[in-house]
Curated annotation (Swiss-Prot):
One of its GO terms (biological process) is isopentenyl diphosphate biosynthetic process, methylerythritol 4-phosphate pathway. Its EC number is 2.7.1.148. InterPro entries: GHMP_kinase_C_dom, GHMP_kinase_C_sf, GHMP_kinase_N_dom, IspE, Ribosomal_Su5_D2-typ_SF, Ribsml_uS5_D2-typ_fold_subgr. Catalyzes the phosphorylation of the position 2 hydroxy group of 4-diphosphocytidyl-2C-methyl-D-erythritol. The lineage of its organism: Bacteria, Pseudomonadati, Spirochaetota, Spirochaetia, Leptospirales. HAMAP family: IspE. This is 4-diphosphocytidyl-2-C-methyl-D-erythritol kinase. One of its GO terms (molecular function) is ATP binding. It comes from Leptospira interrogans serogroup Icterohaemorrhagiae serovar copenhageni (strain Fiocruz L1-130). PANTHER family: 4-DIPHOSPHOCYTIDYL-2-C-METHYL-D-ERYTHRITOL KINASE, CHLOROPLASTIC. It catalyses: 4-CDP-2-C-methyl-D-erythritol + ATP = 4-CDP-2-C-methyl-D-erythritol 2-phosphate + ADP + H(+).
Amino acid sequence: MISPAKINLGLEIPFKRLDGFHEIRSVFLKISWGDDIEIEPASNGVFELFSNNEIILEKRKLYDQVSERGDIKNNILYKTFIKARSLFPELPGVKIHLTKRISPAGGLGGGSTNAASLLNFLFSWCPFFTSDEMFVLAAEIGSDVPFFLGEGHAFVTGKGEILEEIEVHHGQGILALTPQVMNTSEMYSLLKKPLQESASQKNGNTLSKNLISILKNGDWSSLQGRLWNDFEPVAFQLHPELGVLKDKFLEFGSSYCSLTGSGSSMYGLVQGLEIQEELLQRLRQEFSNLTFVRFNF
């Protein structure tokens, strides 16, 4: 089954919370591209991972360092299994076959989506493991993990644990798998957001009616200027070539283009399959050193 990547339609970071996390506001979309993962119970009760690394060459070693070929104790799947088993010793062991395409440090939720796939599997095997307990556990593992437990798209606030499912029109896009490594903690620190109590937040916890309508109707060009990613100025200052890439996405026919997460991956949404194919070919011709993939949602 697919362990899908996510993209962010807009990512606002209004302030840093007193608990050390940053408050976020973003629309999270699951896309059709991602990792392939197969999980089965292991009779010996242990954790086994067998992975095939298909991440772009420049970032391939980042995954291998935490795979079964490196230090497995730093792998999010292993951490998820150990944490779940500590709460529910009755859980079975697992044997996981993973084709890894989503790179670390890409803003696509590659670790979080795998963790959610494993939690959903364990939940199906453990009748006394309630959905509320799974959600709490997911939030402890990673801020993006709760989103991947669901099936749909969501407006996400808090540190990532407050989810409001939303309706989004079917659409297509192109994803650029870029080689730049963006350390999430470093990117947040570079934003230099003011410290503030979460309780003092008075607005911004809901999408405007205008944005809800745009998302339902799939008018992606109307998102430009209405949804933005606060990490883009920092990312483009560190890596000006990413700003050039965004300009070309828009020049070549993308209706809306943005960095996803804290970077470094970038995507463009298009109006229809014909424009999607034309955009893909022009980007591949302009940036022959980069990897581009089609996706839909």
